[in-house]
Amino acid sequence: MVNTKNCQSVFPVTRATGPERFLLRKFASKSTTHANATLPFLPASRQISLVLCVLVFICWLLPGLSGHEPWKPDEAYTFGLIRHIAQTSDWVVPTLAGEPFMEKPPLYFVVASFFLRLFSPLLGEPDAARMATGFFIVIACYAIALSARELFGKGAGRWAVLILFACIGFPVRAHQMITDTALFAGGAIGIYGFILGIRHHVLGGAILGIGAAVMFLSKGLLGPGILGLTALTLPLMNTAFRSRRYIVFCAIAFLVFCPLVVPWLYALWMRSEKLFSTWLLVNNFGRFDGTAKLGPKAKHFFYFKLLPWYAFPALPMAAWWLWRSWKTGISASAMVLVTFFLAGFVTLSSASDARELYAMPLLLPLVILAAGACQQKTLWTIKLRPWALGLFCLLPTVMWGAGIILMTGWPAPLWNKWVAQGAPGFTPQISSVMFAAALLATLLLSGLVFLNRTCRESPLSIFTSCITLCWVLAMTLGMPYLDYTKRYSDVFLPLRAWLPKDECVASRHLGEPQRALLEYYDGLITLREEKHRGAYRCNWLLVQHDKRHPEEFVDGTLVWQGERPADNEENYQLYRLNR
């Protein structure tokens, strides 16, 4: 049974102890003691220092944000949308290679275009735009830390962020140029608004409204739908949320949300009612009735199968804490997190398409709840420590071995079996900067694990350091190989010499990532046969062929063809048509 002893005191206004302190005089009317926000989460002897946490954060965040071209598939088309806004300042209609792209609202693209303009003199355009991802991840981590502090006390936020870094499925997507990072940040802000609202309903409602707006302007109705379903379900889950104060809290959130999203909606409607309808009906509701076809068709129990590894170790830690806390009663703050997870899980599972990156928001409540498991030092903590140390010694050693093979080509048998066959044409590359960064991270994180008492005694700290070090090694020693296998520059840059001047080029079956990068590398915007009637007046045709199917007949002369290294699916052919 859920403990509702203190239900009558939910959503009181109390003394601010976090970043909301500056708004205290404006919003507070009365205050009571809020123990969790002021009491320490752990004894000083078991608490990881803020400096060490920041060092791990830097080691985890920076590698992967720069040093490579836009990768297929998500980064490629996202970069095309960002460049359009940077060049035209048109934030109303996201445009990809000359065509409106109404799948997502423009928040991430606008922010990334700002970073592109700001940093492109120092960084390449893709790297400069990718800084937006780092920006949103920093915001998300800060909001997660504040939520954990509200729930468990001072210092809990550090452990929640460390748990997030340890989640196996998170690092890759958290460093990519994708709108889901902005959605993730909005979800973290929204959750903090819910939890803060329990003791400060006005400011909490305002923060919830901001989080919902960020989610809406990142990926449409999906994010606010999860927050809205959470808000509607909470009164059913806990009597603490059946009060006038909670109604005021929700009303404030709605009043803050509307002015932030209406300007873009109104501008889009005024620009084109047809585009507005496409965005609303196809790219939002179409996710659930199957008409959008925005991703792979959802398989049965997709997220049931995904989360055990994707959210490890947050999922088992959160489940363990909930099981231990159920007998004594789960607080209203914890019930917010449980409800958000259930609402998100049901919403995502009911969609017609599914991808692992869609599960990113589900990590938010799990990592915050999992922080509670760090409070209790049990027999399992002692038993898991040797296993964590073993992983820390084993996995980075394997990564270093793989990195040496990629840098030197030695030993030859392993190179020929694993590298030469998987990426034909790739040559060993040694970067002194990347090698130095990998070595420095290895020494730093190894010293953290073996020399710092708090980290040495915590299996979670050891495992997080292990995942972080493996990520650093992959993004330094393995970056040349990964970039070689995922970029399109090796295909489209040679194509430039064969393209006609001052003549239109039609295209067939050309995907969104390919269209975006053709414009970036070659300055070419094709006329798609599937979209433009004028394409049939062009004398040139660029075909994207799926090698798993027979080639289509083209009445013309093959002028050029190319493909990405070791790509078993895509092949590109340029024809001069017989017209």
Task: Label each PLM-derived region with a short phrase.
Residues 13-15:
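N-terminal start and proteolytic maturation junction detector
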Residues 204-206, 210, 324-579:
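Membrane-embedded architecture of ER/inner-membrane glycosylation machinery
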Residues 3, 11, 23-384, 568-571:
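Membrane-integral, polyisoprenol-dependent glycosyltransferases
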